[in-house]
From Swiss-Prot:
It comes from the Eukaryota. Residues 9-56 form the F-box domain. InterPro entries: F-box-like_dom_sf, F-box_BR-signaling, F-box_dom, KIB1-4_b-propeller, Quino_amine_DH_bsu. This is F-box protein At1g10110. It comes from Arabidopsis thaliana (Mouse-ear cress). The lineage of its organism: Eukaryota, Viridiplantae, Streptophyta, Embryophyta, Tracheophyta. SMART domains: FBOX.
Length: 399
């Protein structure tokens, strides 16, 4: 190693191979700090990646910046000046990328750490024949066939996928009209550069979209009749519906139909249903988890019957961040506990924010101390925009 005149080691002169060896053992935050040491360390980081991060972070919105809370360190980090993009609101994330939209319902994909920005096509770039009216204030109207006009609509369920190396992306979103989920779903990819509409199911019926999840180029859609649709995006921009899958003809029916429901995927690709139950006798256990049960035979007949059963653990060593559609591995990962659900909830009536981790086996709830002044939710006609969001950032090589 080179030294200065007084014999002090000159760390900026470390060879790239040694720096790369060090970088791959650093945590996400230490890697980010190392990049700022000097120009040689920064350029060495362009061809390196840190240890894969599985620790959930929290995004909090301010006027001109975002605050990001590292749950492992329990520290806040402030983004660079984001200007008007700080008023955008996140609806989905993939790694360090966050899908956001502004008051005029323009969509962007932003990396708050770099910050890189991908502008998505305006809604007018659509082959659906649907016209969008965007008066502002985070709402919009849709005009179908120049006759039917929706009432006030807001962005609903959304998913985002981004390839860290090529920056290819897929964005899928639905909307709610008067707080009721719509059956219409729109998607856009880097190759398409316009908005397309997800076709109706092969049966031709339209069911409202309650939730969506995406993994391994497949989009899972939970509909209002409890059925699950799976669309394969691996063959190009036009998705192909998969009719023969384990969840075909096995709708999910719950005894609490009015409670919030989430559909999530495990790391192995299995579907789990997560239901928020925060009233009555279930205050101690705010979530119920369901999984497709094993095949059994009834006493009355030899027909195989498959249903959904309550489970008290995720597969293997996994945990769930509510704002993500796929569970996370926890083995050998600091800052995240096995069989836990990380969630953030803000009450419309009181604006009291709960940022917590719920341990499924013990029913223990750990609350994070998030100062109230660090988040400024926006109220608009009963809509609370700007809730904090959990996400799991990562650095790819070359960032």
């Amino acid at each position: 190693m080179a030294t200065d005149d007084d014999g002090t080691p000159n760390w900026s002169e470390l060879v790239t191979d040694i720096l790369s060896l060090v970088f791959k053992h650093l945590s996400f935050t230490d890697f980010a700090r190392a990049k700022t040491v000097c120009s040689s360390w920064y350029f060495a980081s362009k061809s390196s990646s840190p240890r894969k991060n599985h620790t959930p972070w929290l995004i909090l919105y301010q006027d001109t910046h975002w605050l990001m809370f590292n749950s492992d360190e329990e520290k806040f980090y402030r983004t660079v000046y984001l200007g008007r993009f700080a008023e955008c609101r996140g609806v989905a994330s993939c790694g360090s990328w966050v899908l956001v939209f502004d008051k005029e319902i323009n969509f962007y994909i932003i990396n708050p750490f770099t910050p890189q920005l991908i502008r998505l096509p305006p809604l007018e770039y659509s082959n659906t024949g649907t016209k969008f009216e965007r008066p502002g204030n985070y709402v919009f109207h849709l005009l179908f066939d120049d006759r039917h006009r929706t009432s006030r609509a807001i962005v609903g369920n959304s998913v985002l996928w981004v390839d860290e190396k090529t920056k290819d992306y897929l964005v899928v979103w639905s909307y709610k009209e008067a707080f009721v989920p719509s059956p219409y779903i729109y998607y856009c990819s880097k190759r398409g550069q316009e908005w397309f509409e997800i076709p109706a199911s092969t049966c031709g019926k339209l069911f409202r979209c309650l939730d969506m999840a995406y993994k391994d180029e497949k989009l899972y859609i939970l509909t209002s009749n409890g059925s699950i649709r799976i669309l394969d995006f691996s063959l190009g921009d036009l998705p192909r519906q998969i009719d023969n899958h384990p969840y075909s003809h096995r709708p999910f029916v719950t005894e609490f139909p009015n409670h919030k429901m989430g559909m999530r995927l495990t790391t192995s690709g299995d579907v789990v249903m997560i239901q928020c139950v925060t009233t009555g006798t279930h205050k101690r256990s705010p979530f119920r988890i369901f999984k497709l049960s094993s095949i059994t035979e009834t006493k009355e007949s030899s027909h195989e019957v498959v249903g959904w059963e309550t489970v008290h653990s995720f597969e293997d060593e996994e945990s769930l961040v509510w704002d993500l559609s796929v569970t996370l591995p926890t083995k050998g990962v600091s800052g995240i506990k096995k069989d836990s659900i990380y969630y953030c909830h803000t009450s419309l009536s009181s604006s009291i924010r709960e940022t917590c981790a719920y341990e499924i086996p013990t029913h223990k709830i750990t609350a994070y101390d998030i100062p109230k002044q660090d988040i400024k939710p926006i109220r608009h006609r009963g809509i609370l925009i700007g809730e904090a969001r959990w996400f799991v950032p990562c650095f790819g090589a070359g960032e």
